[in-house]
């Protein structure tokens, strides 16, 4: 069980931070327990707020469960970040508005050229940033160490848009140095360490 696994990991000497990346579907059932066993934050995948588009992407009709998971994590006091894959057909504005309403950082991740992504024609985060700037105001790269430390260490480059109160991060898996700052051990859903 995930909670027992995290409890065990927390006891390992040298483990400083445990952050979980999840689709959020079961998070509504475990948010409080995850906080209690020492999870330091959760990154939740949310590629759309449109139920039909969500179904096309995931093959599941579980958008409401994901949204409930986000609420449960926040209620439990877990720091939450939202992740969305930067697909060419993505309309980022509903996600930005949701992040703003929920006061959560939002990160856009370029599509990786593996599996389905090999056949996919994406757009760069630079293009997406320009699209967002047209709606959300001027974008300034965040450089203040104190502000950035709240975002945690990781591959995202954060921007503050003049008309938004939440930061928007961009993880450039293709057009940037995606893994040059990685300092993580990852446990896959299948139980493998990467």
Regions found by a protein language model. Give the residues of each.
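Auxiliary Fe-S-binding modules of radical SAM enzymes
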Residues: 100-101, 111-194
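Radical SAM/AdoMet-radical enzyme domain recognition
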Residues: 2-109
